[in-house]
Regions:
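Collagenous Gly-X-Y triple-helix signature in extracellular proteins
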Residues: 2, 7-264
Length: 264
């Protein structure tokens, strides 16, 4: 203790624990706090990955293994979506890009956008958003479920084959698919108004590969779903092809599932 102007003062010390600059060495609560503060880029880089134990059944796939989520961007589309660290599944431990597959190439089952061949109702009313994505969230550890923010995303939520700007509205969800513009940075098949509310993710803007491989057969490239409807077709949603290009696919086809989330 020391006396200052006649008063005795007790010296106090406090220990402050800073996040590790190695993403994988941090727990979900730390990543959440950094995301909420908007300071993720001070510690980590786009493309950094962290292993997450996925244990559950979603889209008919029962899985119990560690899959790596990687950083898509920091404070992505901040004026619409707020602070956070956006991630996508997935990668293998050695960094190979993968998507989940189940009954790959079949119809009406597995990772289909809808169980019948229609895009009516768009993203908001799709089987993918209403059933598969929540089931995937439930397959994540509780600590990660708590770290994931309800995220606002704009999409065509009507479908039906008309490129109508009024069809693009907001939804909130913890697990989402990426949109065509968020991956490619341009519009090919999606509603032409989606891009007015979206930004391309830095991970893809930086030139990283859009090709993904089947989680169960990592030598086999797979087509993977996007949440954007094919605006001028009543039965298709957008997808990324095995060469990384922009294409579309019938809604009840089972292809790759590569979900995203925001930690904040």
């Amino acid at each position: 203790m020391c006396a200052v102007q006649g008063f005795w003062h007790q010296a106090c010390t406090a220990t402050v624990s800073l996040p590790s600059k190695t993403l994988a060495d941090n727990d979900p609560a730390t990543i959440q706090a950094v995301g909420a503060a908007g300071t993720g880029a001070s510690y980590w880089a786009v493309g950094d990955k962290i292993g997450i134990a996925v244990n559950g059944t979603f889209g008919g796939l029962t899985l119990n293994q560690t899959v790596y989520a990687f950083i898509l961007g920091f404070n992505h589309n901040q004026s619409v979506e707020g602070n956070g660290i956006d991630f996508q599944f997935g990668k293998t431990a050695d960094g190979r890009d993968i998507a989940f597959v189940q009954s790959y190439g079949s119809t009406g089952t597995g990772f289909c956008m809808n169980t019948t061949n229609t895009n009516s109702g768009g993203w908001k009313n799709s089987h993918m958003m209403k059933t598969i994505c929540p089931a995937f969230l439930n397959a994540l550890p509780a600590a990660w479920r708590n770290a994931i923010k309800n995220c606002t995303k704009y999409s065509d939520n009507s479908g039906g084959g008309s490129d109508n700007a009024s069809y693009v509205t907001a939804t909130t969800q913890k697990i989402f698919l990426l949109a065509e513009f968020e991956v490619h940075g341009t519009r090919y098949y999606a509603n032409s108004a989606e891009r007015n509310y979206q930004k391309q993710y830095d991970y893809y803007k930086n030139g990283n590969s859009k090709v993904k491989y089947q989680h169960s057969s990592t030598g086999s490239a797979c087509i993977w779903w996007l949440r954007s409807v094919y605006a001028t077709n009543a039965a298709y949603f957008c997808r990324v092809y095995t060469d990384g290009g922009a294409y579309s696919n019938i809604a009840y086809f089972s292809i790759g599932f590569a979900p995203g989330f925001k930690a904040a």
